[in-house]
Amino acid sequence: MEQTEEHTDTHTDEQDEAVDRNDRKERIGVVESAKMDKTITVSVRRQMKHPMYGKYLERSSTFMAHDEGDEANEGDTVRIMETRPISKNKRWRLVEIIERAK
C-alpha cells in the first residue's frame, strides 16, 4: 500500500502577494514639475563616494509619478512608491506629501 504524505503548507498566495507589495521601492524627493494632468516629476538626490578619490558627490535621478488627485505642487517634498507601469514613462505613484513648499 502506498502512503501519501499530506502537504501542510501554512503559507498562502495572499501572504505572498502582501509580502511582495511591502517590498516595493520607495524614494523621497522634491517635486520639480506639476504641470501635467495627474503626473508629477520628482527629483531624488543621493550622495555617492567617488571610488578613487573618496570625495562625496551629489547625484540626482528624475522620476515621473502618478498623482491621482493633483495634490502635489512644485517644491513639495514627497514619498513615491514603485508600482505597475501606468504609462510609457510612469512607474511610480505618490504615497504622501511629507512637507509643503513654503
Curated annotation (Swiss-Prot):
Listed A to Z, the keywords are: Ribonucleoprotein, Ribosomal protein, RNA-binding, rRNA-binding
Signal peptide (from-to) = none
MF GO annotations: rRNA binding; structural constituent of ribosome
InterPro entries the record matches: NA-bd_OB-fold, Ribosomal_uS17, Ribosomal_uS17_bact/chlr, Ribosomal_uS17_CS
Q: Which GO terms describe its cellular component?
A: cytosolic small ribosomal subunit
* Region feature Disordered, mapped onto this chain: 1-27
Q: What is this protein called?
A: Small ribosomal subunit protein uS17
| Origin species | Salinibacter ruber (strain DSM 13855 / M31)
